[in-house]
Amino acid sequence: MKILVINCGSSSLKYQLINPETEEVFAKGLCERIGIDGSKLEYEVVAKDFEKKLETPMPSHKEALELVISHLTDKEIGVIASVDEVDAIGHRVVHGGEEFAQSVLINDAVLKAIEANNDLAPLHNPANLMGIRTCMELMPGKKNVAVFDTAFHQTMKPEAFMYPLPYEDYKELKVRKYGFHGTSHLYVSGIMREIMGNPEHSKIIVCHLGNGASITAVKDGKSVDTSMGLTPLQGLMMGTRCGDIDPAAVLFVKNKRGLTDAQMDDRMNKKSGILGLFGKSSDCRDLENAVVEGDERAILAESVSMHRLRSYIGAYAAIMGGVDAICFTGGIGENSSMTREKALEGLEFLGVELDKEINSVRKKGNVKLSKDSSKVLIYKIPTNEELVIARDTFRLAK
């Protein structure tokens, strides 16, 4: 069984060829700068530890996918004889709106429904659709499955997802909290439940911390609240995104500085967060080095970020009536021992006891970070969104 997993951005295409039953990754890679000068392909055959990087023009996603297929089927460095060996194709789709609470086989009606949500994710959904249509064109007859970032959070109740705006804004404009990183939160909370012995009842907080960051309360295997909202701008302070701020501050800054809507949107999404407060970089590693060196703005940025993360952990423990486990995932969550330690400072009242010695050692895989005496399990769990997409595609396409 071979599933091709596609994650299409506006100028990028990530791919993996996976066996969802054995979890074996045959090949993976990335096409970037599609439609821009300096287009690049990265191709890796995992079992052979073979990597290739190629700079070649890719005017569109069609040329990018053709290049991927030619490498996958190459006689010398390929992993399949032809695309006939690809059983189905799974696509990451960022926004499923209220229409999709789970992954679906793609047909014309599904394509139209995804397109109808373009307003909710103007940077992502059109690119996702482009990837789907390109696969349909180049590999006709293959089953395609859409796996939505928002689907896992469709179990939230109205008290968690409604905004206290006039009700017609929800009914007519679909303005509400949707949440993102759902595939990651689903996977990590599922692994945590397995570690716990798959109990009937569980209260898990998952912290997906990367350049984009979100936190989710997962009760009995279902998302009951999450930090991101209508868009990925709400919630935690991130690399370049502001997260939660007073909406009136947006209008105040916009008017005082004479900014257009697009400029204000750019300011909140690309110039805020760690970059905005620290001023030198949006990279967590640069921030941590500057904190160690005593940079005052770095210390400020880190303390604001950790204060907000701790606030969410406490709030979600309150919403669920306690917490059994706290999990860290994502590039920062998995690799930054400082972030994990600072995030849990002051949470001893919840029964949280971090083993700082184990936390400071870099280990791969699922790692227990809590002391044996801790009432709350603390784990570092690498996410695997591609595997979730492959499994759902296999389940729906077989």
UniProtKB/Swiss-Prot annotation:
<feature type="binding site">
    <location>
        <position position="385"/>
    </location>
    <ligand>
        <name>Mg(2+)</name>
    </ligand>
</feature>
<dbReference type="InterPro" id="IPR043129">
    <property type="entry name" value="ATPase_NBD"/>
</dbReference>
<feature type="binding site">
    <location>
        <begin position="283"/>
        <end position="285"/>
    </location>
    <ligand>
        <name>ATP</name>
    </ligand>
</feature>
<feature type="site" description="Transition state stabilizer">
    <location>
        <position position="181"/>
    </location>
</feature>
<dbReference type="Pfam" id="PF00871">
    <property type="entry name" value="Acetate_kinase"/>
</dbReference>
<keyword id="KW-0963">Cytoplasm</keyword>
<feature type="binding site">
    <location>
        <position position="92"/>
    </location>
    <ligand>
        <name>substrate</name>
    </ligand>
</feature>
<dbReference type="GO" id="GO:0005524">
    <property type="term" value="F:ATP binding"/>
</dbReference>
<keyword id="KW-0547">Nucleotide-binding</keyword>
<keyword id="KW-0460">Magnesium</keyword>
<dbReference type="GO" id="GO:0006083">
    <property type="term" value="P:acetate metabolic process"/>
</dbReference>
<dbReference type="InterPro" id="IPR000890">
    <property type="entry name" value="Aliphatic_acid_kin_short-chain"/>
</dbReference>
<feature type="binding site">
    <location>
        <position position="14"/>
    </location>
    <ligand>
        <name>ATP</name>
    </ligand>
</feature>
<feature type="binding site">
    <location>
        <begin position="208"/>
        <end position="212"/>
    </location>
    <ligand>
        <name>ATP</name>
    </ligand>
</feature>
<keyword id="KW-0067">ATP-binding</keyword>
<feature type="binding site">
    <location>
        <begin position="331"/>
        <end position="335"/>
    </location>
    <ligand>
        <name>ATP</name>
    </ligand>
</feature>
<keyword id="KW-0479">Metal-binding</keyword>
<feature type="active site" description="Proton donor/acceptor">
    <location>
        <position position="149"/>
    </location>
</feature>
<comment type="function">
    <text>Catalyzes the formation of acetyl phosphate from acetate and ATP. Can also catalyze the reverse reaction.</text>
</comment>
<protein>
    <recommendedName>
        <fullName>Acetate kinase</fullName>
        <ecNumber>2.7.2.1</ecNumber>
    </recommendedName>
</protein>
<dbReference type="GO" id="GO:0006085">
    <property type="term" value="P:acetyl-CoA biosynthetic process"/>
</dbReference>
<comment type="similarity">
    <text>Belongs to the acetokinase family.</text>
</comment>
<dbReference type="GO" id="GO:0008776">
    <property type="term" value="F:acetate kinase activity"/>
</dbReference>
<dbReference type="GO" id="GO:0000287">
    <property type="term" value="F:magnesium ion binding"/>
</dbReference>
<comment type="subunit">
    <text>Homodimer.</text>
</comment>
<feature type="site" description="Transition state stabilizer">
    <location>
        <position position="241"/>
    </location>
</feature>
<keyword id="KW-0418">Kinase</keyword>
<dbReference type="InterPro" id="IPR023865">
    <property type="entry name" value="Aliphatic_acid_kinase_CS"/>
</dbReference>
<dbReference type="InterPro" id="IPR004372">
    <property type="entry name" value="Ac/propionate_kinase"/>
</dbReference>
<feature type="binding site">
    <location>
        <position position="7"/>
    </location>
    <ligand>
        <name>Mg(2+)</name>
    </ligand>
</feature>
<comment type="pathway">
    <text>Metabolic intermediate biosynthesis; acetyl-CoA biosynthesis; acetyl-CoA from acetate: step 1/2.</text>
</comment>
<dbReference type="GO" id="GO:0005737">
    <property type="term" value="C:cytoplasm"/>
</dbReference>
<keyword id="KW-0808">Transferase</keyword>
